[in-house]
From Swiss-Prot:
Location (main, coarse): nucleus
Name of this chain's protein: Microtubule-binding protein TANGLED
Chain segments carrying region Required for binding to TAN and location to the cortical division sites (CDS) during cytokinesis: 1-132
Function: Is required for spatial control cell division during plant development. Through an association with microtubules, acts both for the positioning of cytoskeletal arrays that establish planes of cell division during prophase and for spatial guidance of expanding phragmoplasts toward preestablished cortical division sites (CDS) during cytokinesis.
Subunit structure: Interacts with POK1.
Tissues/organs with expression: Strongly expressed in flower buds and root tips.
Record's subcellular location: Nucleus, Nucleolus; Nucleus; Cytoplasm, Cytoskeleton, Phragmoplast
UniProt keywords, alphabetically: Cytoplasm, Cytoskeleton, Nucleus
Region described as Disordered: 131-218, 290-354
InterPro entries: TAN1
Organism: Arabidopsis thaliana (Mouse-ear cress)
Phenotype caused by lack of the gene: No visible phenotype.
Length: 473
């Protein structure tokens, strides 16, 4: 066995660090170089000229002069207050204390620093001289013992320094590997089991990690979302655009209410039928009207004037039973009563809306009601006069011009009959103006009697008073 030194001696050796004389010598050399430079600077400040590292030095060109210029006042005050104190003993003689005040401040600071460096260097030299002979004696003893007695075991100080916890753990691992190899050779089990046993790696799992592996962990979320782990579940759309969801109106309203970031496609597909075409190929057509003869008037009704008497018969030939083409008449920008001048070019063998409108404004019907104009107040005006062309059929039979009907006029599309010209003067806008001012109505009738072509825009009034406005039905 290898002999080892006792632990007590080893502890003593660790406590006392060995002094390296080489390092101390190098530091002394550096200090000497610094001293040489400082002495050169001191010489230039005193008044001489020296060149340090190729640069001409003058008293005010040095950095030390610029740095210490601010401290000049402080140092002068300190010297005045402490006159009894003497400068440290150095190159400057102690017999002449007044020389410091005569010299400049940087020269004084340089002298003090030089003296301090000299003292430090002297101390280091004394230490080197004290250590050097002891080390030489030890080396002599070792050489003499090796020559006489022969080789001996080396000191274990270096080994103790190198041994770290990492090296200890590596030694333990090496021992375990050797033990495993011995067990493999001794065991009679098949090789496959041996390989399996050697491959098992037992990992220590902390309780925090075990707790995190629950439902709220990120790994669990990733397994839930990805189709790799659950191929039977359809993909969920993260942050879908509600504009491109081709669901029902209720489903879109539900989405805007909840504002949930995740909406599964299978939920939407279960709500609506799968046979629907996708939104990219869906062509939305406008809703078809109930009949061809229905008139759509967008603007709300403002004034409805009927000079005729309300008929007793119910609506029979209207498209929807309750509505008729002349239900609303607007005296604003647009009016529902279409003048016959505009529709002369578009007349067809079928009964157009303009022809239906013209039925309710036959000259006989309007002429009979003009006599009753004074008795009817404008507040009692109703919509029922314009409702249906077949309501006032009894009056058509009594009229002297009953033979000329709008259907007959439609067949004669090229020639403009006198009845159609006469009918122009009985448009609803003109009848409304007749109630407002009878003088204007007489002028307009006189113009129409001369068989002049009057445009539809000139027939309509610009302003209508508010007393004729009737609320919506």
């Amino acid at each position: 066995m290898v002999a080892r030194t006792p632990q007590k001696q080893r502890k003593v050796a660790m406590v006392v660090p060995p002094l390296n004389s080489d390092l101390l010598k190098e530091t002394i050399n550096k200090v000497d170089k610094c001293m040489e430079r400082l002495q050169e600077l001191q010489y230039t400040i005193a008044g001489g000229t020296k060149v340090v590292s190729g640069v001409n030095l003058s008293p005010r060109s040095t950095r030390i002069y610029l740095k210490t210029s601010l401290r000049c006042k402080q140092e002068t005050l300190r010297i005045k207050n402490a006159t009894n104190k003497k400068s440290p003993v150095g190159k400057f003689p102690a017999s002449s204390p007044g020389d410091w005040r005569k010299m400049s401040l940087p020269a004084m600071l340089l002298g003090e620093t030089v003296n301090e460096i000299l003292q430090a260097s002297q101390v280091t030299r004394d230490i080197v001289d004290a250590i050097a002979p002891k080390k030489s004696r030890k080396s002599r003893r070792l050489t003499m013992s090796q020559e006489d007695d022969g080789p001996k075991t080396p000191e274990t100080q270096q080994k103790s320094r190198e041994q770290n916890p990492e090296t200890v753990s590596s030694n333990i691992k090496a021992r375990r590997k050797k033990e495993k190899q011995n067990r493999r050779s001794e065991s009679d089990s098949p090789p496959s089991l041996q390989r399996a046993r050697s491959r098992i790696a037992f990992r220590t799992i902390s309780p925090q990690v075990k707790g995190n592996n629950g439902e709220n962990s990120f790994r669990h979320l990733a397994n839930r979302v990805s189709p790799k782990h659950k191929p039977w579940v359809k993909k969920a759309v993260l942050f879908p655009n509600p504009l491109f969801i081709s669901g029902t109106a209720t489903q879109q309203a539900k989405f805007s209410r909840t504002m949930s970031p995740v909406i599964a496609r299978n939920e939407i597909s279960s709500i609506k039928n799968n046979k629907e075409t996708p939104y990219k190929f869906l062509i939305k057509s406008p809703p078809t009207s109930a009949s061809k003869f229905q008139v759509k008037i967008r603007s709300p009704p403002k004034v409805l004037v009927s000079p005729t008497r309300n008929g007793s018969n119910s609506v029979r030939k209207s498209p929807r039973g309750s509505r008729s083409p002349t239900r609303t008449v607007n005296l604003g920008k647009k009016s529902a009563s279409i003048s016959p001048i505009r529709n002369t070019g578009k007349r067809s063998p079928k009964l157009s809306t303009a022809a239906k409108l013209r039925r309710s404004f036959t000259p006989t019907r309007n002429g009979s009601n003009l006599a009753r104009k004074s008795s009817i107040s404008p507040k009692r005006v109703t919509l029922q006069a314009f409702l249906s062309p077949t309501r006032n059929g009894n009056f058509c039979k009594k009229s002297p011009k009953a033979s000329i009907s709008p259907t007959r006029v439609c067949n004669k599309s090229q020639k403009l009959s006198t009845a159609a010209k006469f009918r122009r003067s009985f448009s609803p806008s003109r009848l409304a103006m007749r109630f407002v001012s009878p003088m204007k109505s007489r002028k307009s009738v006189a113009k129409c009697d001369d068989h002049e072509m009057v445009s539809g825009l000139k027939q309509r009034p610009v302003l209508v008073p508010k007393r004729f406005s009737i609320r919506r039905i």
